[in-house]
């Protein structure tokens, strides 16, 4: 242990013996709590990199910007690495590393120091770290153990206001990580003194039913902490785009904290209040940052009827920055597997189309109108647009797969499908909008499934999504006993957009098990779908349903 960090530990321990120096900002009876999410530029990983990250964590916890917060969430994988793993206390034991191990003889320095920092600041602190645990501590797990006798996990750790470890969650869906998964997936929650129970999950977990969606369905959790080191992917899965869409679809509070290295595809943090949208968010497009973003978060009542809207953070009022391939590294989705059509935007004119695009029996109807903005100036560049439909597995190498049914308008850097899912290379004013969309509407009839989630999926050239005030979303069953849902997603009539990258519906069917219309009649009956029901009759006509939905909507608005 270096002298510098020995003295830091001593100072924090002394301060830790005097908890409560920061005033509690929220009470159990309050309508709001105050949360902070940290966008954090990680140190280049080495055996000693954790010390620089730790200093950055402590500085943020003690900063003036964080003073009013009840809870602070730090990102995934920005503290330590496989070369500096630590044991983590079992939350059932209510261990306070700051008091029980002040000299860091069992737990690593950073765990003890952050326990003391939480105690000194009197805040709930959520961190993510690389954890080690002896294989013998989990006798029910009979899988082969590493030669050193240790499992290594990607783990969230929660300290309460006293510095006690009150919660621990280990990532279920690893993203190409050389780490262990738990023997069985964990559904983990923790209670707070301000009357909110949080669930938590990590990064790639957001695309799967367990544990994120399962905590909502089975336990009614309305608030989540979400550390991430997300690698953004065009056109459907950039960080803030995904965070906001998930929170909106589930109507929950999401505290999302992201690693911040845009040059390798990492950035994206925000606080989201369900159907009300974003309270604060950021997508960096430079070298990254170490900063906390704070918002008052309205609490959900048990009836989920609270509709108070918190004031947006002043950090939301910022100059729009147009993304380019040089400002942010983007992964690319396999859009060549979509059934797609180039949207022909004739220069110097306005236009409109009503088009249905199907892949197999899954169809999306697009009702679009635009106004031309003229030709690009010399050296200028602009995006082309495609309409696309996809019904199949989302496959990436060496990671868990999920089944999706997507409908979207998305940009391309050229006219070929191979140009889609890419940012333009030009920056600033050299990127020019070719059209303004004056009408955008997508109509789809989706089959129900045992587990599925549909959400609005949008992206602007600032790499931030549209807000709920800018669009209309409806999702309903045509009859009570049907097994399909009619979805309409449209730009509000008062809105016109010229900086759009993506406008679509993301249909996440997870493992696609027990999806209506998929499998044999015996399998459908086993899943609870009754033969000869109105749902089955509706399925037979679902190719025409999107056209009917949009025709009715157009008639009502005219």
Curated annotation (Swiss-Prot):
Induction: Induced by ethanol.
Tissue specificity note: Expressed in larvae and early pupae. Expressed in third instar larvae.
Active-site residues, record numbering mapped to chain: 76 (proton acceptor), 171 (proton donor), 203 (nucleophile)
Organism superkingdom: Eukaryota
Membrane topology recorded in Swiss-Prot or TrEMBL: Lipid-anchor; GPI-anchor
Domain spans labelled CN hydrolase: 33-299
UniProt KW keywords: Cell membrane, Glycoprotein, GPI-anchor, Hydrolase, Lipoprotein, Membrane, Signal
E.C. designation(s): 3.5.1.-
A molecular-function term among this protein's GO annotations: hydrolase activity
Prosegment location in residue numbers: 532-558
Positions bearing carbohydrate: 65, 103, 120, 128, 180, 354, 379
Segments passing through the bilayer: none
A single GO cellular-component term on record: side of membrane
Compartment annotation: Cell membrane
Lipid-modified residues, GPI-anchor amidated serine kind: 531
Signal peptide per UniProt: 1-22
Major subcellular location class: membrane
Family, similarity comment: Belongs to the carbon-nitrogen hydrolase superfamily. BTD/VNN family.
PANTHER family recorded: BIOTINIDASE, BIOTINIDASE-RELATED
Protein name as it appears in the record: Vanin-like protein 1
């Amino acid at each position: 242990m270096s002298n510098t960090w020995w003295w830091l530990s001593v100072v924090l321990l002394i301060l830790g013996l005097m908890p409560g120096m920061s005033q509690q900002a929220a009470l159990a009876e309050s309508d709001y709590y105050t949360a902070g999410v940290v966008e954090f530029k990680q140190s280049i990983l080495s055996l000693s990199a954790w010390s620089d990250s730790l200093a950055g964590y402590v500085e943020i916890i003690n900063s003036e910007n964080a003073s009013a917060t009840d809870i602070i969430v730090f990102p995934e994988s920005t503290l330590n690495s496989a070369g500096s793993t630590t044991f983590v206390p079992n939350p059932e034991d209510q261990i306070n590393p700051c008091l029980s191990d002040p000299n860091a003889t069992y737990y690593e320095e950073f765990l003890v120091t952050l326990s003391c920092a939480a105690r000194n600041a009197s805040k709930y602190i959520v961190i993510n770290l690389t954890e080690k645990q002896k294989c013998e501590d989990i006798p029910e797990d009979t899988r082969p153990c590493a030669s050193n006798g240790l499992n290594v996990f990607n783990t969230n750790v929660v300290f309460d206001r006293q510095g006690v470890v009150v919660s621990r969650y280990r990532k279920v869906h690893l993203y190409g990580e050389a780490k262990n998964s738990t023997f069985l997936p964990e559904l983990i929650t923790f209670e707070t003194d301000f009357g909110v129970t949080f669930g938590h999950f990590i990064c790639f977990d957001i695309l799967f039913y367990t544990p994120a969606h399962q905590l909502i369905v089975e336990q009614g959790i309305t608030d989540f902490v979400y550390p991430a080191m997300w690698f953004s992917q065009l056109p459907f899965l950039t960080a803030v785009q995904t965070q906001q869409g998930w929170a909106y679809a589930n109507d929950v509070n999401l505290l999302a904290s992201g690693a911040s290295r845009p040059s390798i595809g990492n950035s994206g943090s925000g606080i989201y209040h369900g159907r009300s949208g974003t309270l604060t968010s950021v997508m960096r497009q430079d070298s990254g940052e170490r900063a906390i973003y704070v918002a008052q978060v309205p609490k959900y009542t048990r009836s989920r009827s609270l509709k108070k809207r918190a004031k947006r953070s002043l950090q939301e009022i910022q100059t729009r920055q147009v993304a380019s391939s040089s400002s942010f590294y983007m992964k690319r989705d396999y859009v060549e597997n979509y059934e797609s059509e180039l949207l022909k935007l004739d220069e110097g004119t306005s236009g409109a189309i009503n088009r249905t695009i199907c892949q197999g029996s899954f169809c999306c109807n697009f009702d679009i109108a635009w106004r031309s903005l003229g030709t690009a100036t010399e050296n200028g560049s602009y995006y082309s647009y495609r309409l696309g439909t996809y019904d199949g597995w989302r496959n990436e190498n060496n990671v868990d797969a999920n089944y999706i049914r997507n409908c979207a308008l998305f940009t391309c850097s050229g006219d070929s499908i191979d140009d889609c899912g890419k940012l333009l290379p030009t920056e600033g004013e050299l990127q020019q909008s070719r059209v303004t969309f004056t009408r955008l509407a997508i109509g789809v009839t989706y089959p129900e499934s045992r587990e599925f989630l549909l959400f609005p999926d949008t992206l602007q050239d600032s790499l931030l999504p549209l807000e709920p005030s800018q669009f209309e979303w409806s999702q309903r069953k045509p009859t009570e006993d049907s097994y399909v849902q009619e979805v309409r997603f449209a730009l509000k009539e008062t809105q016109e957009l010229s900086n759009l990258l993506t406008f679509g519906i993301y249909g996440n069917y997870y493992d696609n098990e027990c999806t209506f219309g998929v499998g044999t009649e015996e399998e459908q009956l086993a899943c609870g779908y009754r033969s000869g029901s109105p749902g089955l009759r509706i399925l037979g006509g679902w190719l025409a349903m999107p056209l009917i939905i949009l025709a009715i909507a157009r008639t009502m608005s005219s």
